[in-house]
Amino acid sequence: LGDVYKRQGHMVFSTLHTNDSLSAFTRLIDMGLEPFLVTSSVREVMAQRLVRRLCPNCRQKHEPTLAIREKYEGLAKSFPALFAHEPLFFEARGCAKCQHTGYKGRLGIYEVAVLNDEVADMVLHQRSPAELQQAVRKHGFRDLLEDGLLKVWQGETSVEEVIRVAGQTGIEDD
């Protein structure tokens, strides 16, 4: 039905349950859509997760582990404009205002994959999400983990929270 509206010139927004944005292409094909219909109908896909926001009243500065600092060095090279300022590393402490959780509220972490010609060709040939990720990275793609780590760098959430939500990362505390 969404494809019918799309062909009539209407923009369609939909929800699909996948682990990341790039898996949406595979999921749509697995649901029975022809690859050429996917590539002609989809402009971009976005994955999102909610992480808990550090309580501004009780968050406490801390020094990240070596593994985390090394991960940030790589991110700073890939996204220099985003990681230009000094980091604000905080950890959750807990107080009466946040009911001793260390967190108050939520914020989103996102990844957006744009379907350009190269990616469309890869979807047509049913390439894996890993191969698709290599292609979109050439155009500034940031995955959920990287966007979450940017939010850590900005002092909005903790590394532990991003790991909890975005999954295994190889940067767990030593």
What are these regions (language model features)?
Residues 2-174:
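Short, flexible helix-loop junctions that flank or precede catalytic/ligand sites
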